[in-house]
């Protein structure tokens, strides 16, 4: 009997539990033993591994976070640590490992694949910053969370005639700010991929004021930085009271949206099928609305392309 293990690593993302459920149930349906590794690579290093069954994944498809947990593990970044982790997997009789996470998690999976462990990577991160796939599990739920917050901030901004800077996650990738900003009608979208032009921001605010606009929403990806500096510049140049709202880790939680659940279920099912067919050391992706695979090393090295087309649309419609 084959044995497959599941590990979640890095920042949690809504949809991880739906993916865990899909992997576990596909394994059980096909007569494969399934093991859960608690607390990511740290749990692997400590042998924190248990056998899962149908009840282990009952009533989790709608839950955010990860029932397996996640934790940092500096030891696993070393060559000795990786060899130790591989040996622990072998000691537990594990034939294949499915890793749910982002770039760092995939680098760990790639390292294990090079020392004889069959691995499959599934992209789970709200940042949508993995270049080899169009979308990552958790991204659209985070966008929904941010869009809901923007709707509430629009109400209070209009009541008081204010501008509001909404800082969202995205150190190197501004997709959360871009997608939620376009979907919510933000006047300005500030992302790390585009150089900040404060005059453009303030000119939009002033044009809006002249035609009686009461609110001004500015989306800011955290990678741009300087939320309070931008606030001060806006107030100095326009005289408009400006508030800063940092959404923080609320973006990672909550019930996963339908799209994330569907993608997670499809990817989890495919991961098991690939291991059954001995097609491993791969990463699963969504490209052009299709679920595909690429070599895991390619997934780690592919650079993210910015959605210039969507950014240009945002500029045209936020006059």
From Swiss-Prot:
Allosterically activated by ADP and other diphosphonucleosides, and allosterically inhibited by phosphoenolpyruvate. Its cofactor is Mg(2+). The active site is at 127 (proton acceptor). One of its GO terms (molecular function) is AMP binding. Keywords: Allosteric enzyme, ATP-binding, Cytoplasm, Glycolysis, Kinase, Magnesium, Metal-binding, Nucleotide-binding, Transferase. GO terms for biological process: canonical glycolysis; fructose 1,6-bisphosphate metabolic process; fructose 6-phosphate metabolic process. It holds the Pfam family PFK. Disulfide bonds: none annotated. GO terms for cellular component: 6-phosphofructokinase complex. ADP binds at residues 21-25, 154, 185-187, 211, 213-215. It catalyses: beta-D-fructose 6-phosphate + ATP = beta-D-fructose 1,6-bisphosphate + ADP + H(+). SUPFAM superfamilies: Phosphofructokinase. Its EC number is 2.7.1.11. Mg(2+) binds at residue 103. The keyword Metal-binding applies. Pathway: Carbohydrate degradation; glycolysis; D-glyceraldehyde 3-phosphate and glycerone phosphate from D-glucose: step 3/4. It is found in: Cytoplasm. Substrate binds at residues 125-127, 162, 169-171, 222, 243, 249-252. ATP binds at residues 11, 72-73, 102-105. Homotetramer. Belongs to the phosphofructokinase type A (PFKA) family. ATP-dependent PFK group I subfamily. Prokaryotic clade 'B1' sub-subfamily. Catalyzes the phosphorylation of D-fructose 6-phosphate to fructose 1,6-bisphosphate by ATP, the first committing step of glycolysis. This is ATP-dependent 6-phosphofructokinase. It comes from Finegoldia magna (strain ATCC 29328 / DSM 20472 / WAL 2508).
